[in-house]
Structure formats: C-alpha cells, structure tokens
Amino acid sequence: MLSRRIIPCLDVRDGRVVKGVKFRDHIDMGDIVELAMRYRDQGADELVFYDIGASPEGRSVDYAWVGRVARLIDIPFCVAGGIRDVETARAVLHAGADKISINSPALGRPQLISELADAFGVQCVVVGIDSIREEDGQWRVRRYTGDPSKTQALPMRTLDWVAEAQRLGAGEIVLNCMDNDGVRHGYDIAQLRQVRALCRVPLIASGGAGEMQHFADVFDQADADGALAASVFHSGAIPIPELKRFLRAQQIEVRDGQ
C-alpha cells in the first residue's frame, strides 16, 4: 500500500499566508517561506500553495515567492492560482514547483487540462474542485472562490466534473469541501466516498480537519490518498510529528518524518 500523505495547505494573498472559514473572512497567518520551512522541518510530505486572488483578479501567481520556496525546501510542492495556459504553467514549474493545480481556469476552458497533461505529463497536473452541497442534495461546483464578491455557482455536478477532469488528463484530484472548510468538524466523508468510487487517480481530501481522528477517518473510511489541512497546522493545534505517530498507531501507513 502506498503511504498516505499529510499536506499542509497555504492560502496566499498579497504575499502572505491567510486562512478563512468556508472560503470567507481570511486572517493573516504568517510569512510564506517561514511557514513552508516549518512544515518541512516537521515532516510534511508535501505542500500546496493557493494564490487565492489570482484567478478572480485575472492574474497569474507571483513567481518570486515560488522561487524562494523552491530554494529553501526539499519536499515536493504544488502551486495554484491563475494558471490559464501552458506558458504560465511552464513558468511556475521553472520557478521550482513540482506540480501545478488548476481550478477555475479549467472550468472556463476544460481543454486546458489536456494541454497541460500533454506538455508536462499527467503527474504534474492537479485539478482542484471547490464543491458545495445544494438544497436539492446534490454537490455542485463553485468558481472563483478566492473572492466572495466574484464566486460563481455553477450547474455542473461535482461528480460529473471529477469524471470529466480525469478523462481530460488530470493526474490528481483535490476535493475542497466548502461546507466543511475551516470549521474543524471533520472531512466530508459521504462526499469523498462518492468521489472515491469513480476516481481512478490519487484523491486528496480538503476541508474540515479538526483533530487527529479526522485524518484517520478520511483514510480509513473514504480511502483518500492524502489529507490536506490548513488551520489546524497553522495554529499548532495538530503538530505533524504527533499526527504521524497517531496514524501509525492505528496501522495507517505514513511516510517517515519526525
């Protein structure tokens, strides 16, 4: 069995790491590079950086901080934010990122997934999906969630988009469960199970981690390949070394770290 991955998520705005609740009311959490180095030292398996303002503002990610992170850490990291074409993706990878993640731009032009997979290989292409449960009980996709004033509700069902993204060449899916984001009540196991049933590529769970058992649950009950979290790591509520010891005690395979 492949080891499960523990992945701190760093939302970036104006050159700083921020964190909100349900994608709203963001507060400053610290310096990008300092937090990246802290998580590297604690034994994180990889990092994900979301420039949450890039797509709503119609710009690309700032390559300068990508380069600084790449020079100082030796674990894989993924970058998302305003990647609309192969040239921008190439610049992000050239700056030092190991993977690129696309979300809103792919919803506007799904063929972008195939273009990136053809250019760099599926192993470099992550598709992030911001999903929320509607009143009719269906999970549907949101776009431009980094800016509450520009967020768009789309008619597309989350499960349909997962299937389409895979068909087009996504090498990994990150499911951001918006209803659970930042509230620390646990991952959305029901939704993740449905996505897992049709997801043939690695599935990363995001949104809702509040205690160590939540990580064990998402691995055992939803068979996620990795668990992404932000607030519990930024605040120090869950130290990564302790989390890995806890998971090993429950016979969940995780990579060596502190």
Curated annotation (Swiss-Prot):
Reaction(s) this enzyme catalyzes, per UniProt: 5-[(5-phospho-1-deoxy-D-ribulos-1-ylimino)methylamino]-1-(5-phospho-beta-D-ribosyl)imidazole-4-carboxamide + L-glutamine = D-erythro-1-(imidazol-4-yl)glycerol 3-phosphate + 5-amino-1-(5-phospho-beta-D-ribosyl)imidazole-4-carboxamide + L-glutamate + H(+)
Active site positions, chain numbering: 11, 130
Cited Pfam families: His_biosynth
Gene3D superfamilies xrefs: Aldolase class I
Gene Ontology BP, a term: L-histidine biosynthetic process
UniProt xrefs under SUPFAM superfamilies: Ribulose-phoshate binding barrel (SSF51366)
Top-level taxonomic group: Bacteria
The UniProt record lists the keyword Iron: no
Annotated GO CC locations: cytoplasm
GO molecular function, one term: lyase activity
Pathway listed: Amino-acid biosynthesis; L-histidine biosynthesis; L-histidine from 5-phospho-alpha-D-ribose 1-diphosphate: step 5/9
Family to which the UniProt record says this protein belongs: Belongs to the HisA/HisF family.
Role: IGPS catalyzes the conversion of PRFAR and glutamine to IGP, AICAR and glutamate. The HisF subunit catalyzes the cyclization activity that produces IGP and AICAR from PRFAR using the ammonia provided by the HisH subunit.
NCBIfam families for the chain: hisF
Protein name per its UniProtKB record: Imidazole glycerol phosphate synthase subunit HisF
